[in-house]
Design a protein with these regions (language model features):
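Ligand-binding beta-strand-loop-alpha-helix segment within the catalytic cores
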Residues: 13-15
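Conserved catalytic-core segment of NTP-binding enzymes
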Residues: 1-11, 20-129
């Protein structure tokens, strides 16, 4: 409810609201009605899990058919760092409906040295081609909900 949101915003420096879910999959392409960004939203974070890389889109991407169409690849194409960066940076993908808001990418599940190297590849593409800043994160097993 609007009143509760306004109360939270007076109590906190930052309020994080999930604008759309990915059905527990590490990446997604938004549907026509997504994301649902509130007018008070001033920053958008596109989040993707690195566990998606090197797997077919159909196995790791929520709405794989939309992602495949957006990326001009078949649904059985393996998700590469380049494809993930393109999906996250696309105004039909991770940047959909962002407009003039601040936009950043968060790469989660950076749990191994190999995934850290892949995350650097994605981050380099986002920075060099799209001028998008990127952060990485991971949780230890005991920290996961």
């Amino acid at each position: 409810p609007q009143a509760q949101l306004e109360r939270w915003m007076t109590l906190a420096d930052i309020v994080l609201i999930e604008a759309d879910g990915a059905k527990r999959m590490p990446c997604k392409a938004p549907a026509a009605h997504e994301p649902v960004l509130l007018p008070q939203c001033d920053t958008v974070l596109a989040v993707a899990g690195l566990s998606a890389l090197r797997h077919p889109l159909r196995e790791v991407c929520f709405r794989a058919e939309l992602a495949a169409e957006l990326l001009c690849v078949p649904q059985d194409a393996q998700l590469t760092p380049e494809l993930l960066a393109n999906l996250l940076a696309s105004e039909a993908g991770g940047r959909k409906a962002v407009g003039d808001r601040s936009f950043y990418v968060v790469l989660n599940q950076v749990d191994t040295k190999e995934q850290a190297a892949l995350a650097r590849q994605v981050a380099d593409i986002l920075k060099k081609i799209y001028r998008i800043s990127c952060a990485t994160s991971h949780f230890e097993k005991g920290e996961r909900a």
